[in-house]
């Protein structure tokens, strides 16, 4: 129900962004950590 109320309780510790779901915060944290969890099947890049 947070989506409709505008409540965003999950805040990034590195910047001022807030998120409705913790999964979205975890995905956003990759911007700061540089983590690339999925490898390309064609080349060695991630």
Swiss-Prot record:
Domain of life of the organism encoding this protein: Eukaryota
GO molecular function, one term: zinc ion binding
Main localization, broad class: nucleus
Record has Zinc as a keyword: yes
PROSITE patterns in alphabetical order: ZINC_FINGER_C2H2_1 (PS00028), ZINC_FINGER_C2H2_2 (PS50157)
Zinc finger extent (C2H2-type): 1-4, 10-32, 38-46
Intracellular or extracellular location(s): Nucleus
Repeat found in the keyword field: yes
Swiss-Prot/TrEMBL keywords: Developmental protein, DNA-binding, Gap protein, Metal-binding, Nucleus, Repeat, Zinc, Zinc-finger
SUPFAM superfamilies associated with the record: beta-beta-alpha zinc fingers
A single GO cellular-component term on record: nucleus
Disulfide partners: none
Record GO biological process: segmentation
One Pfam family per UniProt: zf-C2H2
Family per similarity comment: Belongs to the krueppel C2H2-type zinc-finger protein family.
PANTHER family in the record: KRUEPPEL-LIKE TRANSCRIPTION FACTOR
Role noted for this protein: Krueppel is a gap class segmentation protein.
Descriptive protein name: Protein krueppel
Organism: Pholcus phalangioides (Longbodied cellar spider)
């Amino acid at each position: 129900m947070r989506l409709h109320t505008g409540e965003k309780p999950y805040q990034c510790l590195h910047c001022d962004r807030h998120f409705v779901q913790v999964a979205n915060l975890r995905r956003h944290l990759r911007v700061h950590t540089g983590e690339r969890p999925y490898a390309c099947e064609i080349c060695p890049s991630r």
